[in-house]
Amino acid sequence: MESTVDGLTIRRPRYNVSAESASGYRREAGVREEKKPRQRDAGFGAAVPVLLLLYVLSVRGLVHISLRQLVTPGGHSTGFNASTAREYLQQITSIDSRTAGSPENEIIAVNYLLGKIKDIEEKINSVHRITVDVQRPTGTFSIDFLGGFTSYYDNITNIAVKLEPEHRAEHAVLANCHFDTVANTPGASDDAVSCAVMLEILGSLSSSSKPLKHAIIFLFNGAEENILQGSHGFITQHPWAKMVRAFINLEAAGVGGKELVFQTGPENPWLVQAYASAAVHPFASVVAQEVFQSGIIPSDTDFRIYRDFGNIPGIDLAFIENGYIYHTKYDTWDRILTESIQRAGDNILGVLHYLATSSQLAESSQFRHGNMVFFDVCGLFVLSYPARLGTIINYITAAVTLFYISKKMIKYKQGGTNYVRDLVYGLIITLVSWVSALVTVLIIAVLVSLAGKALSWYTHFYVSIFLYGSAAVAKFILVHSLAKTYFFAGASSQYLGDLFFDISLITWCIPLVLLTQSGLCSAYFFAAWIIFPLLTKLLLQPDIIHQGSPYKFTAVYLLGLFPPYLHTMYHVWAVFEMFTPILGRSGTEIPPDIVLGFLIIACTIILITYFISFIYLLKSTKKIIVTLAVLSVLTLLLVCSGMFFPYSSSNDSPKPKRIFLQHTTRTFHSLTGEVVKRDSGIWINGFDYTGISYVTPHIPELNETVRAPCDDAPLCGFPWYFPVHHLIRKNWYLPAPPAPINEHTDFKLVSREEMSWGATRLFFEVKGPSHMTVYVRPNTNTVLSSWSLGDGIPVASGETDYFIFYSHGLYAPAWKFWIELKNSAKESKGIVTVAVGSHYFFGDSRNSPDLETLELKFPDWSFPSSWVCTYDLYEY
């Protein structure tokens, strides 16, 4: 058939719709056709989209309220006093940056903690006993974090406090925090507040007249920021480690807010049940657990160490709000609300007491098997059930959906309507709308990135909603509106509304089955999106569906969507609260606008799927499409004009740009030991996609002419502190005189031994600052077969290089290690290149006049973290 629109002739497909589907009511075979009821073919009015918008905003408001639950300090009978914990927090952070190995960390912070523990011990109730042990372990291990590297530590500091019944205990639960910080930061949220909470919990429990059944070990670990060294030292070497049956790890990926349970287990479902029973203000998600364990978040915690090296199950909690100032100078005690401390203290105290008085702790091996589906409901309570039960529920849900769809197929077939064809076409149209919206958003993201305006939403998150969210929704509506006009012409609005409701069921049934089949507990998420809407549809009275007021129908329909919609919006908040700040420190190679565009598309698809049927019920969608398109285009123009600056120096809510400044002296030695190259300068790394484009106007000498070259040397010839060179490929090297260093690193080959099995073993000795990194690159035809580190099997950090992270406490002897290489051919140029990076984070050598001068030039919306380092390369 043909129609004329604005002078254009449009040929529509020959698509015959039965009279039954056109009129919008059904007639079963063999049943007398009833009088045609009043239809809604005229379509819903313009007020319905407004109602949908108000619905979305109302749900978002409820989520906001649930996340801002105020907890009055001392207002609960848990026994936890947030005011006391806050005093501890303030005093701990008054100690300067507590880098492992520094006097601030190894002496001042340790003495402070020991003093407070002694004060608590003096007030202990006679039913308890406290034992304190200061551990200074030495050890080594390999980890596959950040591409894989090996760690070695010497004489670091842990403080372990055991609270147990008067007559001792055989089993224990471990509570872990760390009091060290990354360089140049006060580390209030990461992780001083957790240590303050643990001190107050220790005081509360030890003064209680209620005896414990099991011991609680409070571990204040002093080297977590050295990539989990402190926890490894405890769990592999401390005699109390054998007592531990479960642990709670307290961490941070943000500053303040609610602490999220984002990892549990492995297996041991009784731990989830313990949290669900004892946490006063729960905040937990199995979805967060499976996202974190997928590795897409570039972070790790002590949970991994206790799980992998101690074979102990546990609970991992972290503050996730305001990650913009995580690991910056803005992570100060005054930014953490007392209510946040109270909430965390109530939860952790409750769970620790529950575990320490539970019979399950001693017999945990009997309850080991199986995973749990768990999630909190707006912070009110935790809903949890065994994963095997979840599997049954999921498959039953899928089967009921299949039965429902099959029944409709039979009914429509008897009535002469080709429902199966419509269903297939509808699924294709839905997929086309998804792909079309994704392509549109990616095109916009690429344009923004090419225009040099990436991260424009970093400080103004609403910009991303207007820019990408509006475009996505407009494209969804446009595709379905075109399908309604030119593909489903002649079909009744009620029939199409029902059809796309069924398509929504099928849409979520597919991931439900796939995730369940993969053993992922997150599948419950999609089960909820099927169960509640389907139940509502089945319970709706036919007169409401076919004859009732559009607003009555809409209200009842939205009421059925409310549980999954609220739960999804709750998770959507968590996704953007976590990932938006991460995109400001994810390196120079990942376009953040493209990643955010993907996230917005994914969340929009989930939130809008059950609204698609309204497109087919509305009289017109033209104004909605135009409004959304104009909003997106206008936002794009404002973004490209530079209207929205990415960073902020606001005192209330700073969102700084992160930059590393390393005053570096590089020395390259030949095979004979001669110095073949030496230079010095300030090596600059920006941790986000914008590089230094926003910094150059403030520091003209810092431009593309001083881009750092990638030398043919391990890790491009620069002293990387962590193996993140694959994430940050753009860096700058501003020439400067050598930094004054009081004590240079002494790196030497002690001996060389030819082994009977044809390998060459090189013995090294290193004496230097508390933090050093060694990079090993075997030459052509040479294989690094073993070494004296980790488990003896070398772990590569890339295709050719091996990364070793070394740290020591206040004092340590020279570090000795060996590597073994096998060479298949005689090489005149040697068999291996070894380089050592030395990092001076504290003391007289940590700064230089040139570094101070450059740092002062950086704008106030940036956070330059600076230190002095050296890079020495040797060939053997």
From Swiss-Prot:
Zn(2+) 1 binds at residues 178, 190, 251. Binds 2 Zn(2+) ions per subunit. Keywords: Disulfide bond, Endoplasmic reticulum, Glycoprotein, Hydrolase, Membrane, Metal-binding, Metalloprotease, Protease, Transmembrane, Transmembrane helix, Zinc. It is a multi-pass membrane protein. SUPFAM superfamilies: Zn-dependent exopeptidases. The record marks 326 as: Transition state stabilizer. The active site is at residue 224. One of its GO terms (biological process) is proteolysis. The keyword Zinc applies. The chain crosses the membrane at residues 43-63, 382-404, 428-448, 463-483, 495-515, 520-540, 556-576, 594-614, 624-644. Residues 1-42, 405-427, 484-494, 541-555, 615-623 are cytoplasmic. Residues 64-381, 449-462, 516-519, 577-593, 645-876 are lumenal. One of its GO terms (cellular component) is endoplasmic reticulum membrane. Disulfide bonds join 177-195. Belongs to the peptidase M28 family. This is Endoplasmic reticulum metallopeptidase 1.
